[in-house]
């Protein structure tokens, strides 16, 4: 339950952002854990000392599935970090709470679907569509932030 201070300052928007952004950060942690597990399962270690500890230098190598996990994680960093900034600032612009919820849920859903589609090697169109939807929502927030800033110059 959000504190009364958060609700008074920003209506229902900031708590909605905090919920969605926290879930996205947890999702990023999950991808990091999946990457580590994939390294162990495939015996593909990024550091020679890890390979030596796990059986020998022959395991100091790359693996396509590990690389896929790393790309998913990098894509998360390229998209979720900007959302954390944009969503936070957007929360204080006084947006309509329903519209803000939609923005945040579109990003959350898009990023989860993108990750599942990418790691699961599902249809690339599904992955691309999820990516575009999440980015569209971020772009919308960015434009609204710029609009508000321009009106206060």
Swiss-Prot record:
Residue sites binding glutathione per the record: 39, 74-78, 114, 118, 127-131
Lineage, opening ranks: Eukaryota, Metazoa, Chordata, Craniata, Vertebrata
Family membership noted in the UniProt record: Belongs to the MAPEG family.
Cofactor(s) the protein requires to work: glutathione
Subunit structure: Homotrimer.
Protein name listed in UniProt: Prostaglandin E synthase
Stored InterPro entries: MAPEG-like_dom_sf, Membr-assoc_MAPEG, MGST1-like
Catalysed reactions, semicolon-separated: prostaglandin H2 = prostaglandin E2; 2-glyceryl-prostaglandin H2 = 2-glyceryl-prostaglandin E2; prostaglandin G2 = (15S)-15-hydroperoxy-prostaglandin E2; 1-chloro-2,4-dinitrobenzene + glutathione = 2,4-dinitrophenyl-S-glutathione + chloride + H(+)
Matches recorded under Pfam families: MAPEG
Bilayer-crossing regions: 14-42, 62-91, 97-120, 125-153
Disruption phenotype: Deficient mice are viable and fertile and develop normally. However mice display a marked reduction in inflammatory responses and reduced pain sensitivity. PTGES deletion results in a reduction of PGE2 levels in the central nervous system in association with the impaired LPS-induced febrile response.
Activity regulation text: Activity is increased markedly in macrophages and osteoblasts following pro-inflammatory stimuli.
Example of a GO cellular component annotation carried by this entry: membrane
Inducing factors: Induced by pro-inflammatory stimuli and down-regulated by anti-inflammatory glucocorticoid.
Segments on the Cytoplasmic face: 43-61, 121-124
Keywords linked to the UniProt accession: Cytoplasm, Fatty acid biosynthesis, Fatty acid metabolism, Isomerase, Lipid biosynthesis, Lipid metabolism, Membrane, Oxidoreductase, Prostaglandin biosynthesis, Prostaglandin metabolism, Transferase, Transmembrane, Transmembrane helix
Pathway field: Lipid metabolism; prostaglandin biosynthesis
Role description: Terminal enzyme of the cyclooxygenase (COX)-2-mediated prostaglandin E2 (PGE2) biosynthetic pathway. Catalyzes the glutathione-dependent oxidoreduction of prostaglandin endoperoxide H2 (PGH2) to prostaglandin E2 (PGE2) in response to inflammatory stimuli. Plays a key role in inflammation response, fever and pain. Also catalyzes the oxidoreduction of endocannabinoids into prostaglandin glycerol esters and PGG2 into 15-hydroperoxy-PGE2.
EC number: 5.3.99.3, 1.11.1.-, 2.5.1.18
């Amino acid at each position: 339950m959000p504190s009364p201070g958060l609700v008074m300052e920003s209506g229902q928007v900031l708590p909605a952002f905090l919920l969605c952004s926290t879930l996205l950060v947890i999702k990023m942690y999950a991808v990091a854990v999946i990457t580590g597990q994939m390294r162990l399962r495939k015996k593909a270690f990024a550091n020679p000392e890890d390979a030596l500890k796990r059986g020998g230098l022959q395991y100091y190598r790359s693996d396509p599935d590990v690389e896929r996990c790393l790309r998913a994680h990098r894509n998360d960093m390229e998209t979720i970090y900007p959302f954390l900034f944009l969503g936070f600032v957007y929360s204080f612009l006084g947006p309509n709470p329903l519209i803000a919820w939609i923005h945040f849920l579109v990003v959350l859903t898009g990023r989860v679907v993108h990750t599942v589609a990418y790691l699961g090697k599902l249809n690339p169109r599904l992955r691309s569509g999820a990516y575009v939807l999440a980015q569209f929502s971020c772009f919308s927030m960015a434009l609204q932030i710029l609009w508000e800033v321009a009106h206060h110059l």
